[in-house]
Curated annotation (Swiss-Prot):
<feature type="transmembrane region" description="Helical">
    <location>
        <begin position="46"/>
        <end position="66"/>
    </location>
</feature>
<feature type="transmembrane region" description="Helical">
    <location>
        <begin position="1"/>
        <end position="21"/>
    </location>
</feature>
<keyword id="KW-1003">Cell membrane</keyword>
<keyword id="KW-0472">Membrane</keyword>
<dbReference type="Pfam" id="PF01957">
    <property type="entry name" value="NfeD"/>
</dbReference>
<keyword id="KW-0812">Transmembrane</keyword>
<dbReference type="InterPro" id="IPR012340">
    <property type="entry name" value="NA-bd_OB-fold"/>
</dbReference>
<dbReference type="InterPro" id="IPR002810">
    <property type="entry name" value="NfeD-like_C"/>
</dbReference>
<dbReference type="GO" id="GO:0005886">
    <property type="term" value="C:plasma membrane"/>
</dbReference>
<dbReference type="InterPro" id="IPR052165">
    <property type="entry name" value="Membrane_assoc_protease"/>
</dbReference>
<protein>
    <recommendedName>
        <fullName>Uncharacterized protein MJ0826</fullName>
    </recommendedName>
</protein>
<keyword id="KW-1133">Transmembrane helix</keyword>
Amino acid sequence: MEIGYIFILAGFLVIALEAIVPGLYFPAWGIALLIYGVVLLIIPQYAFISAIIAGVLTIIILHKFVYGVGKEIKVGAERFVGMIGIAIEDFEENGYGRIKIENQIWLAKSKDKIKNGDKVEIVGVEGVSLIVKKVEGE
């Protein structure tokens, strides 16, 4: 059996392994093995060059699959910190009111006196409330 067929078979097996053990980026390795196997079948005399090409393609494919792994993902209210919203009501004496940000309405708390229509910056999160401050010059 030619070595190219072995690489193609290995590529399919590695891709199938993703169905058994998901989340380990096996498809990237499988695609690289498939590409390398096809190249070996088409031009076997250039095995070394095709290995280098397959290695580069593997790095590119893995980068696409793995990009973003390890980055901190902000979920819930934390994703709004640093963004600007608009007050949709006058804030009460206790400092609570509602703001609109990204077409969502959130409960907010502030030490500033905030009126309906004022722009506010989200500076933090406390429980389910956003902590805001009035944007200067508004």
